[in-house]
Amino acid sequence: MEQLNYGYKIKRNQVRGSWLFLVYGKPIYELHRGEKSKTYYVTHIATGKTPACAGLLRDAIMKACMLEGLL
């Protein structure tokens, strides 16, 4: 698990092969790849739905992963 300086962490979910975006220790979003494509998607963990700003969230989480050398 990598600690970032902005109150959030990114943690690898080994079982599902996805990345969890945690804010102050609580998982909020999950970044995962589509089953048949190489496109990344973001899902809100509590609701299981794609948030309205999914594209922006996906880009921000992927950028944070890349900056930390995780993706």
From Swiss-Prot:
Job description of the protein: Targets the host DNA sliding clamp and inhibits host DNA replication.
Biological source species: Enterobacteria phage N4
Lineage of producing organism: Viruses, Duplodnaviria, Heunggongvirae, Uroviricota, Caudoviricetes
Keywords, ordered alphabetically: Host-virus interaction, Inhibition of host DNA replication by virus, Modulation of host cell cycle by virus
Any one GO biological process: symbiont-mediated suppression of host DNA replication
Protein name: Gene product 8
